[in-house]
Amino acid sequence: ITSTSGDFAPPERAKGLRPIYPGGNDNSGLGLDVEKNGNEISVTCMLPITKSADYKIKVPDNLALEIESGCERASNITVTGMKNEIDIQSCHAIDLKNVTGPLVLSTISGNINVTFTGMPDKPVSINAVSGEIDITIPAKTAASLDLRTVGGAFYSDFDFTEPKNNMKKVVGAELTYSLNGGGPKFTIATVSGNVYIRKGN
């Protein structure tokens, strides 16, 4: 844990006492329960929902990462530079930079932004209910795309359909597309948000 911000101190009246939380203990002094079981490390926020905190945690880039953020906390999630599996379930924004996946991402009301520096050899699933999805993938990516939206639209500078201002657009539909001969399956779905798929380097 490289940096934090938040109010972790107990009230003055609790001097000499320790906080008790359901499901774990604040064994870090930062409102977190940190446990190690074999090769697995779990970090759980124990703060009551009336308190807020931001955490920056540095981990090896080849670590498989799983994050679950409940809807009671208005917490955006940012992940940078990971080269292994990432699984994130959230109610808020998800921002991934310089990742290779594979990915399983899901949010209810936030936007999802992903920049790939390489492509996974396993399927990718990205879902948002009311947020938008914006993905940048290398131009030479070989993938099988399964795109779905109810009330949103698809935009891309890959060669999907008729051009519109250097982007292509398909509205309220399901689209299956083989990119550069096909490859691992990409499932990207929204209910009311738009989907943007961009060419990267």
Where are these regions (language model features)?
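Extracellular beta-strand scaffolds
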Residues: A64-L65, E72-I77, K83-E85, A93-D95, ...
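Acidic (Asp/Glu) and glycine-rich low-complexity loops/linkers
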Residues: I1-E72, T78-Q89, V104, T141-T149, ...
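A contiguous pocket-lining binding segment that forms or flanks enzyme active sites
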Residues: V124-S125
